[in-house]
Amino acid sequence: SDSARAKLSQEVLQTLVAENADIIAIQETKLSAKGPTKKHLEILEELFPGYENTWRSSQEPARKGYAGTMFLYKKELTPTISFPEIGAPSTMDLEGRIITLEFDEFFVTQVYTPNAGDGLKRLEERQVWDVKYAEYLAELDKEKPVLATGDYNVAHNEIDLANPASNRRSPG
């Protein structure tokens, strides 16, 4: 596609390839419950041939094709992978929002934090989520250091927003 969004997506992918990172965390994958399609996997293999992937998608009764997270990590790395449930409200634990990689000396975890929703309809649930996720990180940190990555759905400054003017009063 020649759209600006498609061009930007290609630029982001090329930047990720050029960075040659050991671990790449991706949020809001919106994959089906079955995960990446054959085509998705072919593209990942083409762009990131030296990487393994692990993913977590939204599972019923949560919404289909919603949220989701994925890690790409170099094949020589051998983490223990977990998909923790943190006791979040409603279906949030089933929305594919957290993946944790455990290594000998540390954890790498990623999150796609739920937003508070239009009209702040999920604000109370979001506040419970924040407490539960903080407790989860604290438990990991008791064992070994934690690198916590992801989309926290918080915009501290205008630079954190793609469109600051239109998002000024939007929930995170």
Regions found by a protein language model. Give the residues of each.
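N-terminal, active-site-proximal structural segment of metallo-dependent hydrolase catalytic domains
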Residues: 1-45, 55-66
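Residues that flank catalytic or metal-binding motifs in active/ligand-binding sites
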Residues: 49, 66-68, 97, 104
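Structured helix-beta-strand junction loops
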Residues: 19-20, 47-51, 104, 143-144
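Class I S-adenosyl-L-methionine
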Residues: 51-60, 87-89
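Active-site regions of metal-assisted phosphoester/phosphodiester hydrolases
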Residues: 11, 75-172
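Short amphipathic alpha-helical surface micro-motifs
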Residues: 35-37, 50-52, 91-92
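Conserved beta strand-loop-helix elements of the APE1-like EEP
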Residues: 63-81
